[in-house]
């Protein structure tokens, strides 16, 4: 009786074990295919994340410090401000002195603030952000629009309607995307009042970069750049610098994407820059990825 009782259990166990083995094998086959398909988007997203984090490891990844010097700012007459009677009280820390009743801007502070503004602009362009150039000076409208067009961004040099940013879903549609950065070449309108977009951008928490003259209020500008916003050489220099920063950042993004794509790896791990997929030292030097002195 013991043998008769054990035999059916063994047979039943054998019958049940065979389908379980086939099902497990089938599950492993399907799971491997699904995992391989799922790894591709994960690898692409991981590559993109590490490409975006690469500039954050360096203080001046895009080498914007070499784009200008204090001498070039002086030659472009960036240091010339307005009459002392038009001085805004919040601009006094950036004024070097006064000569013949005209305020002189401290170019050392201008160089420091301009480097921060260019670096931030390059980072926004590197991450694919929308950059909007804004001005109400009619004599520079063509220059500013040409600058934005040449670097693949946008410009607004006409009348700026109030609420265009704060009430954008109602005025422009529900699917409209606001700019990620607004660059003000002039923070005042035609009648020397603060530009409406400065106030609206502050309300919408949109970062701003602005050239502020001695008669401007720099409080609502995220990255103020003390400088002359009236002389054509100064405005041309600012446009050239921002255009170069944007185009250089976009070119660096294309180079890094091509480099990681050719190497076929998700990119360097932050804790191990020499991991497979990391750019070689020669490639890093060519891309300007080395630490700035």
Curated annotation (Swiss-Prot):
UniProt key word Ribosomal protein: yes
Pro residues bias spans: 267-279
Region (Disordered), start-end ranges: 21-49, 263-293
One GO MF term: structural constituent of ribosome
A GO biological-process term: mitochondrial translation
Main subcellular location of this protein, as a coarse class: mitochondrion
Biased composition (Basic and acidic residues): 39-49
GO CC, alphabetical: mitochondrial inner membrane; mitochondrial small ribosomal subunit
Residue ranges, compositional bias (Low complexity): 21-38
InterPro entries associated with the record: Ribosomal_uS2 (IPR001865), Ribosomal_uS2_bac/mit/plastid (IPR005706), Ribosomal_uS2_CS (IPR018130), Ribosomal_uS2_flav_dom_sf (IPR023591)
Keywords from the UniProt entry: Mitochondrion, Ribonucleoprotein, Ribosomal protein
Pfam families in the record: Ribosomal_S2
Keyword Mitochondrion: yes
Subunit structure: Component of the mitochondrial ribosome small subunit (28S) which comprises a 12S rRNA and about 30 distinct proteins.
Function in brief: Required for mitoribosome formation and stability, and mitochondrial translation.
Family under the similarity heading: Belongs to the universal ribosomal protein uS2 family.
Official protein name in the record: Small ribosomal subunit protein uS2m
């Amino acid at each position: 009786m013991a043998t008769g009782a054990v035999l059916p259990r063994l047979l039943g166990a054998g019958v049940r074990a065979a389908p379980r083995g086939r099902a497990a094998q089938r599950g492993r086959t399907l799971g491997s295919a699904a995992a391989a398909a799922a790894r591709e988007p994960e690898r692409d997203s991981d590559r993109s994340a590490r490409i975006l984090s690469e500039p954050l490891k360096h203080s001046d990844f895009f080498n914007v410090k070499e784009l200008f010097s204090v001498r070039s700012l002086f030659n472009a007459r960036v240091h010339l401000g307005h009459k002392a009677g038009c001085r805004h009280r919040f601009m006094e820390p950036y004024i070097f002195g006064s000569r013949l009743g005209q305020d002189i801007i401290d170019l050392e502070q201008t160089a420091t603030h301009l480097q921060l503004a260019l670096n931030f602009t390059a980072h926004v362009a590197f991450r694919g952000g929308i950059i909007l150039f804004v001005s109400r000076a009619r004599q520079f409208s063509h220059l500013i629009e040409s600058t934005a067009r040449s670097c693949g961004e946008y410009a607004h040099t006409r009348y700026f309607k109030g609420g265009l940013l704060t009430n954008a879903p109602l005025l422009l549609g529900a699917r409209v995307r606001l700019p990620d950065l607004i660059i003000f070449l002039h923070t005042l309108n035609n009648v020397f009042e603060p530009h409406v977009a400065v106030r609206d951008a502050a309300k919408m928490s949109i970062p701003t970069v602005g050239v502020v003259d001695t008669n401007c209020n720099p409080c609502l500008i995220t990255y103020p750049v003390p400088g002359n916003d009236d002389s054509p050489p100064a405005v041309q220099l600012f446009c050239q610098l921002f255009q170069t920063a944007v185009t250089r950042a976009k070119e660096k993004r294309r180079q890094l994407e091509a480099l990681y794509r050719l190497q076929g790896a998700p990119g360097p791990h932050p804790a191990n820059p020499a991991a497979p997929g990391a750019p070689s030292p020669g490639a890093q030097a060519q891309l300007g990825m080395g630490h700035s002195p």
